[in-house]
Amino acid sequence: LVAILWLYNLAGTFDLPTLRALALSHHLAATPTALLLCSIAFLVAFAVKVPVFPLHGWLQDAVAEAPTAVVMVLAGKLGLYSILRFSFGIFPEQSRHVAPVLIALGAIGIVYGSLIALIKTDLKKLAAFSTLAHASFVILGIFTFTIIGLDGGIFQILNESLIGAAFFILLGLLYERYGTYDMRDYGGLATRHPWMVTMFVITVLAAAGLPMLNGFVGEFLILSGSMSSIVAHHIFWTVFAATGVIFGASYLLWMIQRVFYGSLGHRPEEVRGWDLTAREHLELWPFAALFLAMGICSPFWMRAIDTYGTAAASLQEIDYAADATLPADTTTQDRLALEHARTTYPGLDPELNGHSLPHRAHTGDLITILPLDSKPTQEAR
């Protein structure tokens, strides 16, 4: 709230399009330090909501105590959307300045959340730290400031919203039958609940990033964007985050083994219940179909993200006036198309003709055209 009032004092308006236009034209009446502090205030507020490591202290108890329906909303991605909508939209340059810190926190959050989930015996607390790990993946992707990383981050927001909803529905169904979230009270349920274990396995494999399912596409794009990002400085955080994929698969598969396989739990007299009902099948199978469709038909979904998602993420235009490697009369659209072509098709000389490629880029991608030694041909322009 303090940051919002401060921003109003600087701009004299709460209108988001006006604020964005003032930010992009550098007409906000404030020093760079003041704008940076204001952007950090917004980021901290949204980071608590996501949550971003180490601001996650509230998440475990909130998820463990809240009803399933509330948790499905609580574990949503409003914090991540807010970062894309407000921080990137109003403070694009300032967000890029703090990006290395957020990349590091994202990578640490992936590994930390996965390792803590490995030692949890409460299913809801395990799900809480799984939420932390997967939200950290999105943070890593969007703060790479590359097209592929940003697209992967937006795709992963959609993925985790669906996977999280399916997972918490399944936990609620399990609790409805047995009255506990403690994994030590379960075991050997696969023979009693074959359809339930099938849905659990599909959801877990999607969350773990199995190829041909939706989780793989998002994580692959994020790690690829992180690897190619100049903002990340080097590949250390990418490699570090990639280990979290292994730990993530470990705690998810370990949960399946403890709940549905092996011997009965500590209270075998309470092992009773029924498999999925017709209504529950209708609730869960659309999720499974979406996991597969988004994994196999990912180009279709990525085209939708390219068209609408990046606009929602407030991709800012770039001032290329200082770029002396291109002709002075090169238009911004031609520059963006040339940059996109060269990052998408390295080694090729694209024939754009003004229409064949999206005319968009991000501040972090400016690095890719600054080192060019020769002027582009007229055909390339």
Which residues are covered by each model-predicted region?
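Soluble catalytic regions of membrane-associated enzymes that act on cell-envelope
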Residues: 357
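Hydrophobic transmembrane alpha-helices and their helix-loop junctions in integral membrane proteins
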Residues: 1-220, 224-257
